[in-house]
Amino acid sequence: MKELMRNVYLLDDTLVTKSKYGSHYGEKVFDGYREWVPWRSKLAAMILKGHRLKLRGDERVLYLGAASGTTVSHLADIVDEGIIYAVEYSAKPFEKLLELVRERNNIIPLLFDASKPWKYSGIVEKVDLIYQDIAQKNQIEILKANAEFFLKEKGEVVIMVKARSIDSTAEPEEVFKSVLKEMEGDFKIVKHGSLMPYHRDHIFIHAYRF
């Protein structure tokens, strides 16, 4: 077993997180380790592509676009001594997210529109990391707005960008260049890269706030 980052390992060729919990989305469980499926989680894909985050485990994380909690569940395994504010706007996936929250004490579910951070500003404290996976045209505006409200100075962001959600007619590479340029004024880019073969026409961007 090879350790990749806090509570994240390669078990033979399978990515897993160390966990005291059972399966959340049908993933396999191996004696205290949960399979982390890269085709179901862009963060898992990023890690398998070779980029890792240096997390202590006690961070406060704002997760924008939590959906039904697939990636949230693994991130909660990693920051097991911290807190994840999980924001999701759609009611149906939020119901599944609530199932996860019932057995975890480090996830706070928030049924809000991530483009309106002022609506949950009375709940969310300053965070060390913003993780965003929102397939909307204005996703960089959403990231900047939330960073302004919640991200600590020199806090980190990880955003998953789907080219077709921003401009379905442009070449993905042109969309990605535009997104990176849009981020430059507010963030220092640490690393960006493709999520192929796991997610087509997607990139990850890891950055920190000036």
Swiss-Prot record:
Coiled-coil region(s): none
Keyword rRNA processing among record annotations: yes
EC code(s) of this entry: 2.1.1.-
BP GO annotations: box C/D sno(s)RNA 3'-end processing; tRNA processing
Pfam families cross-referenced by the UniProt entry: Fibrillarin
Binding locations of S-adenosyl-L-methionine: T70, T71, E88, Y89, D113, A114, D133, I134, A135, Q136
InterPro entries linked to this entry: Fibrillarin, Fibrillarin_CS, SAM-dependent_MTases_sf
GO molecular function, one term: rRNA methyltransferase activity
Source taxon at top rank: Archaea
Top enzyme class: transferase
Keyword Methyltransferase part of the UniProt annotation: yes
Gene3D superfamilies named in the record: Phosphorylase Kinase, domain 1 (3.30.200.20), Vaccinia Virus protein VP39 (3.40.50.150)
Record's keyword terms, sorted: Methyltransferase, RNA-binding, rRNA processing, Transferase, tRNA processing
Described function: Involved in pre-rRNA and tRNA processing. Utilizes the methyl donor S-adenosyl-L-methionine to catalyze the site-specific 2'-hydroxyl methylation of ribose moieties in rRNA and tRNA. Site specificity is provided by a guide RNA that base pairs with the substrate. Methylation occurs at a characteristic distance from the sequence involved in base pairing with the guide RNA.
Family in the record: Belongs to the methyltransferase superfamily. Fibrillarin family.
Subunit structure: Interacts with nop5. Component of box C/D small ribonucleoprotein (sRNP) particles that contain rpl7ae, FlpA and nop5, plus a guide RNA.
Protein name in the entry: Fibrillarin-like rRNA/tRNA 2'-O-methyltransferase
